[in-house]
Amino acid sequence: MRVKFHTTGETIMTQDELKKAVGWAALQYVQPGTIVGVGTGSTAAHFINALGTMKGQIEGAVSSSDASTEKLKSLGIHVFDLNEVDSLGIYVDGADEINGHMQMIKGGGAALTREKIIASVAEKFICIADASKQVDILGKFPLPVEVIPMARSAVARQLVKLGGRPEYRQGVVTDNGNVILDVHGMEILGPDSDGKRHKCDSWRGDCWFVANRGADVALIGTPDGVKTIVK
């Protein structure tokens, strides 16, 4: 794993400015003439703004949410359905938490299922995040699980058996018409947690657990500049 810094000087930056810095830094991975996979959330929104400056150089984007689609279109970027695309060079998205193994918890923006699918198609996953998202142990941020509405109670009971404390995210319906359970108390130590991911899939819940696609490159916004971590 390689780490390097792109310094921004000693200027004190807000969290949003750190997100903006990594969003723009991700442009270096965008190749002209390609279709770009785009995530969802406040950090991804900064990347979309940056991508707008290259709209004449790329074919377009595949979006992970209705919100990102609307923003991309407002900037004049063509949005492809994933079914129209054979492959993606890169997928750029934020994270709720990322550990030293480049594994993440995602889904705070309730777009995790589409995010996971698009990331799985991409050759390279570029994670963009501010330094507050770096952790040693995943799980302080509750693990979002997307569930079909009729299975909410059944999935919640299974999550309790796994040691979690599921909380129904009231009033939230995903772009897929599903609901979200935020699971507290699920400390995830590292790659050996694979079994829990399979259980998550098997009872028709969907989550972005450690065993799912990790980042290939992480751009971390810090007070000292953008830190690049390459897996």
Swiss-Prot record:
TM annotation in the entry: none
Which GO molecular function annotations are given, in alphabetical order?
ribose-5-phosphate isomerase activity
| Self-association and partners | Homodimer.
Which InterPro entries does the record match to this protein? Answer: NagB/RpiA_transferase-like, Ribose5P_isomerase_typA_subgr, Ribose5P_isomerase_type_A
One GO CC term of this entry? cytosol
| Catalysis: reaction(s) | aldehydo-D-ribose 5-phosphate = D-ribulose 5-phosphate
Give the EC class as a word. Answer: isomerase
Residues annotated for substrate binding in this entry = 40-43, 93-96, 106-109, 133
Query: Source gene?
Result: rpiA
Record the organism: Escherichia coli O6:K15:H31 (strain 536 / UPEC)
Function comment:
Catalyzes the reversible conversion of ribose-5-phosphate to ribulose 5-phosphate.
Q: Which family does it belong to?
A: Belongs to the ribose 5-phosphate isomerase family.
The pathway noted for it is:
Carbohydrate degradation; pentose phosphate pathway; D-ribose 5-phosphate from D-ribulose 5-phosphate (non-oxidative stage): step 1/1
Q: Which PANTHER family match?
A: RIBOSE-5-PHOSPHATE ISOMERASE
> Which protein is depicted?
Ribose-5-phosphate isomerase A
Q: Please give the superkingdom of this protein's source.
A: Bacteria
Tell me which EC number(s) this protein carries: 5.3.1.6
The record's section on Pfam families has:
Rib_5-P_isom_A
Name the residues annotated as catalytic in the UniProt entry.
115 (proton acceptor)
Q: Keyword set for this entry?
A: Isomerase
Q: GO BP, one example?
A: D-ribose metabolic process
